[in-house]
Amino acid sequence: IKKIIYKPGGASNVAQNLSALGSNVTLLGITGDDNELRELIKVLRHTDIKFDPVKDLSIRTTLKSRIIGNDQQLMRLDHEDRNKSDMQGELLKRVIKYAKNSDLIILSDYDKGSVKFIAADIISFANKNNIKVIIDPKGTDYSMYKNAYMVKPNELEFSMIMGKIKNKKDMIAKGKKLKKDLQLDTLLLTLGKNGMVLFSKDSVL
């Protein structure tokens, strides 16, 4: 091994991008209390992000390793404890605490057990306080995202929920249905190299 580089992933990557654009960002999540957490703290020290994790001593901080050789990925190793934490209640309290002074909440759901159990409560609180909630979803059940401001699936995630996209007309019909079913203000469907489609209140762009 010639070099090991630690980079923020998941919600941490979203937070870093927003911070780089000048936003005032607070990053929350459930972590272990281990070397991986300490490495993440080191990386985030170089940003203006306020990081206040809920530490669960019974789990490991998620670490996704990429083994690179000759400028290409040779292997991926994931170290994580999916759906093993019972600290979601504490995470919800912390989200509400910081949300009171926020304009926007972004939920990066990687289907690891932190977000899905509290998403509906976060959305309910946010709507009562005129705070927008944007969700980057995972999994095959979006019911807990109902009444969010925006849900942003990619093409694969969208197809898992609505079925394979046959053509543009079919995609638009399915997008409108998902937006209506979840009572969203906006649905943003990302299509990789083919761009994205925005389903808003009055139009599809």
Regions found by a protein language model. Name each.
Residues 1-4, 48, 69, 79, ...:
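RNA-binding accessory domains that recognize and position tRNA/RNA substrates
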Residues 1-63:
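Substrate-binding N-lobe of the ribokinase-like
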Residues 18, 65, 105-108, 154, ...:
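Conserved structural-core and active-site-/substrate-pathway-adjacent residues in large, well-folded domains
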Residues 19-26, 100-104, 128, 182:
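Short, surface-exposed connector motifs at secondary-structure boundaries
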Residues 26-29, 52, 104-106, 134, ...:
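A structural signal for isolated positions on well-ordered beta-strands in alpha/beta enzyme cores
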Residues 53-59, 66-101:
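Conserved phosphate-binding/catalytic loop of the ribokinase/pfkB sugar-kinase fold
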Residues 102-114:
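Short acidic, glycine-rich surface-loop motifs adjacent to enzyme active sites
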Residues 112-205:
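Conserved phosphate/ATP/ADP-binding segment of small-molecule kinases
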